[in-house]
Amino acid sequence: MSIFTPVNNKTLTNIVVVRYKKGAAKFEIACYPSKVQSYRSKIEKDLNEVIQIHRIFTNVSKGIIAKKDELIKAFGTDNEQEIILLILEKGELQVSSKERDNQSEQTFKDIATIVAEKCVNTETQRPIPVSIIEKAMKDVHYSIHPTKSSKQQSLEVIKQISSVIPIQRAQMRLNITIPTKESKTLNRDKLMVLVSKIEEEDRDGGGLSIVCLVDPGSYRKIDELIKQETKGKGFIDIINLAVAKEGETKINETGKSAPTSTTTTTTTTTSSSK
């Protein structure tokens, strides 16, 4: 699509329009193809790579720019940057039905991949193939939300498909290191409430080192506790973001889990110090 606008006599080429309705009024922004979804998925963060022209239109195809009083009436402000961000986040992407179907299909696959990376089978603690996740999503009739990122939707999917397959968030493996002085005053009971399993514990040299498994939802609480208890001197290393046994789990027609040993589990490893 090529559109001529009166703004600096600029011709907009190869664009997609994001439209936001506010009552009877509608407002549009001109964006680069494929960049809107990348921005919503937190992949692209540079607005200049997403927005073709930093102006708000009432009709992009005709080059009609929204008036100041129209913006104030609809949004309570004429700050175009704020309004552009709102439209970009919550507006409806104007694409053809074929393009919409292709985007929806890709988002569907992206969500299933994220879920497979984050989760394990509840019964076997093994990874679940993406194909099984996709089938479960279809079984619960999951509908793609065009304005939500794949990551956001993956959390919704985990909850919904747990009704048809045994699935849970994979646990994280952490290495908590606390210096000698601080380890003596550590409130161990508070820490143990947040830890699922201690795999190793070492007091060599006077300090304390604990390798443990934790639920992802407990990570932030553990991080805050260690900071508080050690006055910022403790460290948390993330050994594995998702811990799973080797091999994948097959789900048969009866819903039972049948582990295989043909695939080796891959987990993402990162490290952070607090």
Curated annotation (Swiss-Prot):
What is the recorded function of this protein according to its Swiss-Prot or TrEMBL entry?
Answer: Required for the assembly of mature ribosomes and ribosome biogenesis. Triggers the GTP-dependent release of ribosome maturation factors from 60S pre-ribosomes in the cytoplasm, thereby activating ribosomes for translation competence by allowing 80S ribosome assembly. Required for normal levels of protein synthesis. May play a role in cellular stress resistance. May play a role in cellular response to DNA damage. May play a role in cell proliferation.
The annotated regions of Low complexity compositional bias extend over: 260-274
Q: Where in the cell is it found?
A: Cytoplasm; Nucleus, Nucleolus; Nucleus, Nucleoplasm; Cytoplasm, Cytoskeleton, Spindle
The species is Dictyostelium discoideum
Tell me the protein's name: Ribosome maturation protein SBDS
Q: Which domain of life is it from?
A: Eukaryota
- Which GO cellular component term is one of those annotated? cytoplasm
Family membership noted in the UniProt record: Belongs to the SDO1/SBDS family.
Enumerate the UniProt keywords alphabetically. Answer: Cytoplasm, Cytoskeleton, Nucleus, Ribosome biogenesis
Region feature (Disordered)? 249-274
For this chain's UniProt record, which GO biological process terms are given?
A: cytosolic ribosome assembly
- Chief site of localization: cytoplasm
Q: Which Pfam families match?
A: SBDS_C, SBDS_domain_II, SBDS_N
